[in-house]
């Protein structure tokens, strides 16, 4: 077995810890520093960075197992900050922000919590961008290339992240971006049933980062009509109409989803086979949408952006990439390898000689 790439330092803690909440989600919240483990263990640092604790009311062992595999990949520290160890957190929580976390606040007396520990990798892409839109525009293409390189690395090892969005990309003090939160990760080769994807069931039109094919299959499973689904998707998110206006020559959302529902074998086995073939493209949609949204923010909110070098000299190739990666039809969606080839002339990691951690 490969050596642990982190060698996190564990010390015996005394007194109150006290950690600030960094983020919250459906299954739990993250705190910095990591809360105390039951029995008194305290994770102070991981890979030379402060330890962050992700506390959940669900079992995190699967996420940690995948995290260790992800972090054993070449150049992993430059692209990922995955959880690599876990413990049962000490309760009651002494962290002052614990009361702001609904999962902790609303838990029953017999709730069992788990905590995954990962290195602090900065602030979310959303907050980092909002803090300085000019800085974000100046580093946009380098950031995009770096994230594409990371995707090539983990997908080349057979993984799909399955939860890429603005909140699961962190940017550190040097402007290096890393993917976090591999809790929904899966391997397409292992998909035999829908539940192997770990994305649940039930049509959820508010989840714009879910690829159109996921919405289409959930419509089928819930026995909703395509017309109903399209109306709900468009009502919840303006991105679909904006993408159709920006890229008018490609298939519309209605055409793409309709073709999927007509041509795919709509059984548990049929949907699983489709995802074995096209599951990696869920991430292609997600990163394309992230970076397209950021580009649109520049166009809308950054004065003088259309006079910038990025806009005048790189807009053409960037639109090809963004349009390709946000194709509604996964069969023609652009891969990160193809995107890197267009942007840099290379196909893999190291295209921009990223900062080494």
Feature locations, PLM:
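Juxta-kinase regulatory segment immediately upstream of eukaryotic protein kinase catalytic domains
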Residues: 1-21, 37
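ATP-binding glycine-rich loop module of kinase domains
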Residues: 24-97
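Conserved structural core of kinase catalytic domains
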Residues: 78-140
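Catalytic-loop of the protein kinase fold
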Residues: 154-172
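C-lobe/activation-segment region of protein kinase-like
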Residues: 177-302
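Conserved C-terminal C-lobe helix
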Residues: 313-327
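A conserved short helix/loop substructure at the end of the activation segment
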Residues: 324-339
